[in-house]
């Protein structure tokens, strides 16, 4: 990453920090009244000093992060440091590195156990050529699956800023010579030093703070796609990264921002609008699960289960080989005829409804759906919310963040004119007038469809109560209060989630504030009874950001809501009336918060022991290798 890129990043941090301190939106930053009292000027000066310190610290982390890749390669070589990474260390290093294998291990399940290594804090001084770290950890490893270091936090250790005290995290997975598998998590205090005239930072102190390893007899899951999908064309479609190809072409200048056709009036690499999804369905009622995959740029895939561990692509056979630009799908017997039908969400086109007619899916959107289905559908959920025995539909919608800077003269984003009706634009404009870019960012309206029988749908009379006008990633239903009807939880990005109690026939009541729900970048939600007490609990996917934790911790007078935005996923224990947040980073909390930048985490009982486990996908954006920069936070 270039110095210019560093400065751009620092400027973004500066703007965000000012916004956090002042509690204003981006539009309000810079509109401060210059006629301040002397006391206010002093306060502002201190704030500016604090912000400058934060920016300098974050810039240094940005510049040092690529150096950690050399340590990552050392892990792969099972030598820390190796000949390449040894240059990261000073000629003389103060080291606290005496570690010993766990004296006791805690049995987990199915042959897995974990244990903390003994760590001796005694400091020794050694020369760079003689430095050997974590030798005992590597001694039993046959080969490494993956391993990495990352910055957790850091700060300058002296006024001259020639020393930088950092906390590093390390994690990895390896196969041992014994055949067992091992994972580790470690924390290291590393001091980086430079002289007054130079900018070459080197590690002068290394202290292993903690090291935990998990052992298992074999992996819980093994990648078998190559064996399960024999058809080469289907395999290529399932594994190809066409979005990466388009991204590379765009940044190389071979493809325009506005691509041909109306499907992609704007194209951005870090898209949140077009995202693949997976739906499970027994398409042929043979008792085996089949897989439907929505695609961004090619036709969708229907992988039929051959009952022998393999799948065949048969979308054409069922009429489901539709062109991509799809983001969500859900199967259900919406006409009560005994076979699954399909609702399909499409971000840059209106949603579609396919009826299963003797094994052939027909688009019956115009005939059976009363209103126009919305654009920008991000996810779909189904429940019989009114207790009439028919499945109803909730559509979550999410406006394209990539177009947030494409504004029209009246300050509304272009997508609002392209994808909303005039009436919807008017309602959206009202939401814009009350917006906060981080805490209350508006989006398109969600939609509730009521099943009127024979597979037909109309707008529910409660629709206005659930529209919300937020950036809604996912909604899901569960009878939280045990009154016989399903309640609705909506995970919203850039704002508070919404928990809507179903009081049918008296509509929905928003009980978010009274239920104990915390603010977060909501990107998924799942219901289950994790502690088997007969009451449903809730797992909400949010964002855990090391950078966000660092910045919000160092800014004084911060709006407390901002601190919550980077604290990770939330596990709530339900009591039938309210939620209690039981997850967090403290030792007393359930350790399910630090799941990275999480998307759609789900409860599932992986080991069939009767207790719900959690799977939480995470990540944000990985650039194609041909255009990627040497940076990853």
Predicted regions and their residues:
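Bacterial N-terminal signal peptides that target proteins for export
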Residues: 2-12
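Bacterial N-terminal signal peptides
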Residues: 12-22
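Acidic, glycine/proline-rich Ca2+-coordinating loop motifs
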Residues: 24-633
């Amino acid at each position: 990453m270039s110095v210019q890129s560093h400065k751009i990043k620092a400027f973004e941090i500066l703007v965000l920090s000012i916004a956090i301190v002042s509690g204003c939106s981006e539009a309000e930053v810079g509109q401060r009244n210059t006629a301040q009292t002397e006391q206010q000027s002093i306060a502002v000066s201190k704030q500016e000093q604090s912000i400058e310190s934060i920016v300098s610290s974050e810039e240094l982390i940005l510049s040092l992060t690529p150096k950690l890749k050399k340590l990552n390669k050392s892990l792969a070589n099972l030598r820390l440091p190796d000949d390449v990474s040894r240059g990261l260390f000073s000629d003389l290093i103060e080291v606290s590195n005496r570690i010993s294998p766990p004296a006791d291990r805690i049995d987990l399940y199915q042959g897995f156990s974990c244990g903390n290594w003994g760590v001796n804090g005694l400091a020794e001084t050694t020369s760079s050529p003689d430095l050997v770290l974590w030798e005992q950890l590597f001694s039993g490893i046959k080969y490494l699956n993956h391993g990495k270091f990352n910055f957790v936090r850091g700060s300058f250790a002296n006024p001259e800023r020639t020393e930088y005290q950092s906390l590093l995290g390390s994690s990895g997975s390896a196969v041992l010579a014994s055949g067992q598998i091992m994972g580790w998590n470690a924390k290291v205090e590393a001091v980086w030093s430079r002289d007054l005239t130079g900018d070459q930072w080197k590690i002068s102190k290394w202290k292993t703070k903690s090291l935990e390893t998990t052992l298992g007899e074999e992996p819980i899951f093994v990648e078998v796609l190559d064996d399960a999908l024999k058809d080469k064309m289907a395999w290529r479609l399932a594994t190809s990264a066409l979005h990466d190809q388009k991204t590379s072409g765009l940044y190389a200048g071979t493809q325009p921002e506005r691509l041909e056709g109306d499907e992609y009036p704007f194209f951005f690499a870090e898209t949140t609008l077009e995202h693949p999804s997976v739906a499970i369905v027994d398409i042929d009622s043979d008792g085996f699960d089949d897989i439907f995959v929505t695609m961004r740029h090619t036709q969708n895939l229907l992988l039929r289960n051959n009952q022998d561990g393999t799948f065949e692509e048969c979308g054409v056979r069922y009429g489901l080989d539709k062109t991509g630009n799809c983001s969500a799908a859900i199967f259900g017997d919406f006409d009560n005829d005994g076979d699954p039908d399909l609702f399909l969400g499409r971000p840059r086109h209106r949603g579609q409804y396919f009826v299963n007619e003797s094994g052939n899916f027909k688009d019956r959107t115009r005939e059976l759906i009363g209103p126009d289905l919305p654009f920008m559908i991000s996810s779909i959920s189904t429940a019989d919310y009114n207790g009439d025995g028919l499945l109803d539909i909730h559509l979550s919608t999410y406006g394209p963040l990539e177009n947030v800077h494409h504004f029209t003269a009246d300050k509304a984003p272009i997508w609002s004119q392209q994808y909303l009706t005039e009436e919807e634009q008017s309602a959206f404009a009202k939401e814009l007038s009350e917006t906060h870019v981080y805490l209350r960012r508006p989006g398109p309206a969600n939609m509730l469809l009521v099943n009127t029988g024979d597979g037909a749908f109309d707008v529910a009379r409660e629709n206005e109560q659930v529209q919300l006008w937020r950036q809604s990633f996912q909604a899901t239903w569960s009878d939280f209060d045990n009154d016989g009807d399903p309640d609705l939880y909506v995970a919203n990005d850039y704002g508070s989630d919404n928990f809507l109690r179903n009081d049918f026939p008296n509509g929905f009541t928003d009980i978010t504030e009274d239920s104990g729900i915390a603010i977060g970048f909501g990107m998924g939600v799942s219901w289950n009874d994790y502690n088997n007490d007969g009451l449903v609990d809730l797992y909400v996917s949010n964002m855990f950001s090391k950078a966000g934790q660092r910045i919000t911790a160092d800014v004084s007078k911060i709006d407390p809501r901002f601190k919550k935005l980077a604290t990770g996923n939330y596990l709530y224990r339900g009591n039938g009336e309210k939620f209690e947040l039981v997850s967090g980073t403290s030792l007393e909390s359930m350790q399910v918060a630090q799941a990275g930048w999480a998307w759609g985490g789900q409860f599932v009982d992986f080991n069939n022991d009767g207790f719900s486990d959690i799977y939480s996908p995470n990540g944000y954006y990985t650039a194609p290798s041909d255009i990627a920069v040497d940076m990853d936070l």
